[in-house]
């Protein structure tokens, strides 16, 4: 395989769809640095591994000498992306957006080279557009065209409201590509309508239309739904090394390969080698450990990755308790507290319903003994180690 073909294969790694692939090949063969754009609306202060799928792809282009533009949608963040939503998304304030944007910059530079990354804000050109410019932009498309979007179509069919400003979101995202003169835009498969809008607007402005490279949405820890904080199935890149290690080790062996393809920087040949080793009898757990250590080293450091590995071995294979276990005191009103309420108050579960479910599954323990009675009452004056699942521990004194 030639160097060019090898580089192109790496750029295609994990991609769900490229529109148009032949265009991308032509652009790459010119040998000129291309402008590669990916936009992120700072709707929450922290990123999770699902967000890094696109950032990793930016890194691949960056390593090949292309100009990477990390676009922070401070303007679009105040509109609220309607993609995949069945209700109008709550818009953020300017202050919220800018505060979140600062944390984004800190986090993405754990992956991208800051010296070779352009950080742009789409308010730079959108604020200058003004009311007249926004109306002119709105005239570029029809309501019928906007209703081709699946989410809008479903909401209309179900009698759910669609706010007028939501129609502006894909137009603004498309105009970002015009303002940046993007050669390539990266996005998730759920963004296809918006990404293609960029091509349409660039054509109408006499620009060469951007190539669209779409990446899949990373499945969360459950292996079914996309990774999302609201679903609780995420791995945050600011998670502690211990939490990150435990979460990665909890994924299925099948999902592990998906994470290797989309999150690991290891060459595909090396990953295929892992598969061969497992076919020949290697324990998949050991391969999963390598993935966990690689990701923790990226977002923390090598020492943290090794320490998290050592703690995992001690806790789950040797039965040791974690060194950083929180110590809590829970005060009762009448000298006793129900086990479900205690676990909720200690933050080991999100609700009493979660507590009952974990007890039923045999996942709640007191001093390493399974709790089998959901009506168990804990008396004041006792101290014990409470555990829920494999990763949540607390030494709790009831008073």
From Swiss-Prot:
<protein>
    <recommendedName>
        <fullName>Tyrosine--tRNA ligase</fullName>
        <ecNumber>6.1.1.1</ecNumber>
    </recommendedName>
</protein>
<comment type="similarity">
    <text>Belongs to the class-I aminoacyl-tRNA synthetase family. TyrS type 2 subfamily.</text>
</comment>
<dbReference type="InterPro" id="IPR002305">
    <property type="entry name" value="aa-tRNA-synth_Ic"/>
</dbReference>
<dbReference type="InterPro" id="IPR024108">
    <property type="entry name" value="Tyr-tRNA-ligase_bac_2"/>
</dbReference>
<keyword id="KW-0963">Cytoplasm</keyword>
<dbReference type="GO" id="GO:0005524">
    <property type="term" value="F:ATP binding"/>
</dbReference>
<dbReference type="GO" id="GO:0004831">
    <property type="term" value="F:tyrosine-tRNA ligase activity"/>
</dbReference>
<dbReference type="InterPro" id="IPR001412">
    <property type="entry name" value="aa-tRNA-synth_I_CS"/>
</dbReference>
<dbReference type="InterPro" id="IPR014729">
    <property type="entry name" value="Rossmann-like_a/b/a_fold"/>
</dbReference>
<feature type="short sequence motif" description="'HIGH' region">
    <location>
        <begin position="42"/>
        <end position="51"/>
    </location>
</feature>
<feature type="domain" description="S4 RNA-binding">
    <location>
        <begin position="337"/>
        <end position="398"/>
    </location>
</feature>
<keyword id="KW-0030">Aminoacyl-tRNA synthetase</keyword>
<dbReference type="Pfam" id="PF00579">
    <property type="entry name" value="tRNA-synt_1b"/>
</dbReference>
<feature type="short sequence motif" description="'KMSKS' region">
    <location>
        <begin position="226"/>
        <end position="230"/>
    </location>
</feature>
<dbReference type="GO" id="GO:0005829">
    <property type="term" value="C:cytosol"/>
</dbReference>
<dbReference type="InterPro" id="IPR002307">
    <property type="entry name" value="Tyr-tRNA-ligase"/>
</dbReference>
<keyword id="KW-0067">ATP-binding</keyword>
<dbReference type="InterPro" id="IPR024088">
    <property type="entry name" value="Tyr-tRNA-ligase_bac-type"/>
</dbReference>
<dbReference type="GO" id="GO:0003723">
    <property type="term" value="F:RNA binding"/>
</dbReference>
<keyword id="KW-0436">Ligase</keyword>
<keyword id="KW-0648">Protein biosynthesis</keyword>
<dbReference type="InterPro" id="IPR036986">
    <property type="entry name" value="S4_RNA-bd_sf"/>
</dbReference>
<dbReference type="GO" id="GO:0006437">
    <property type="term" value="P:tyrosyl-tRNA aminoacylation"/>
</dbReference>
<comment type="subunit">
    <text>Homodimer.</text>
</comment>
<keyword id="KW-0694">RNA-binding</keyword>
<keyword id="KW-0547">Nucleotide-binding</keyword>
<feature type="binding site">
    <location>
        <position position="229"/>
    </location>
    <ligand>
        <name>ATP</name>
    </ligand>
</feature>
<comment type="function">
    <text>Catalyzes the attachment of tyrosine to tRNA(Tyr) in a two-step reaction: tyrosine is first activated by ATP to form Tyr-AMP and then transferred to the acceptor end of tRNA(Tyr).</text>
</comment>
């Amino acid at each position: 395989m030639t160097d060019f073909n090898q580089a192109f294969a790496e750029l295609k790694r994990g991609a769900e769809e490229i529109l148009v692939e032949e265009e991308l090949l032509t652009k790459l063969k010119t040998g000129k640095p291309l402008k590669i754009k990916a936009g992120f609306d700072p709707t929450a202060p922290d990123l999770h591994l699902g967000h890094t799928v696109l950032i990793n792809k930016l890194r691949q282009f960056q390593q090949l000498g292309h100009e990477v533009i990390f676009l922070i949608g401070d303007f679009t963040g105040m509109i609220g992306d309607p993609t995949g939503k069945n209700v109008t998304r709550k818009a953020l304030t300017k202050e919220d957006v800018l505060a979140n944007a600062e944390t984004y910059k800190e986090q993405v530079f754990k992956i991208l080279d800051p010296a070779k990354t352009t950080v742009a804000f789409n308010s730079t050109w959108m604020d200058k557009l003004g009311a007249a410019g926004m109306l002119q932009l709105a005239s570029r498309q029809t309501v019928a065209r906007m209703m081709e979007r699946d989410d809008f179509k479903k909401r209309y069919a179900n009698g759910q409201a669609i706010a007028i400003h939501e129609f502006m979101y894909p137009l603004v995202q498309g105009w970002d590509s015009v303002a940046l003169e993007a050669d390539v835009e990266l996005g998730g498969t759920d963004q296809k309508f918006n990404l293609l809008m960029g091509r349409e607007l660039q054509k109408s402005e006499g620009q060469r239309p951007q190539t669209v490279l779409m990446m899949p949405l990373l499945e969360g820890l459950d292996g079914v739904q996309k990774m999302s904080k609201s679903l609780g199935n995420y791995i945050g890149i600011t998670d502690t090394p211990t939490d990150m290690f435990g979460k990665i080790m909890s994924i299925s062996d099948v999902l592990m390969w998906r994470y290797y393809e989309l999150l690991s920087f290891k060459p595909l040949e090396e990953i295929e080698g892992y598969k061969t080793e497992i076919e020949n009898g290697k324990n998949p757990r050991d391969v999963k450990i390598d993935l966990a250590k690689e990701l923790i080293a990226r977002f923390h450091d090598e020492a943290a990755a090794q320490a998290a590995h050592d703690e995992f071995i001690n806790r789950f294979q040797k039965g040791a308790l974690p060194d950083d276990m929180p110590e809590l005191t829970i005060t009762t009103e009448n000298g006793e507290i129900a086990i479900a309420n205690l676990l909720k108050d200690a933050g080991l579960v999100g609700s009493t319903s979660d507590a009952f479910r974990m007890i039923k599954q045999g996942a709640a323990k007191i001093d390493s003994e399974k709790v089998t009675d959901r009506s168990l009452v804990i008396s004041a004056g006792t101290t014990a180690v409470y555990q829920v699942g494999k990763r949540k521990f607390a030494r709790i004194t009831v008073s």
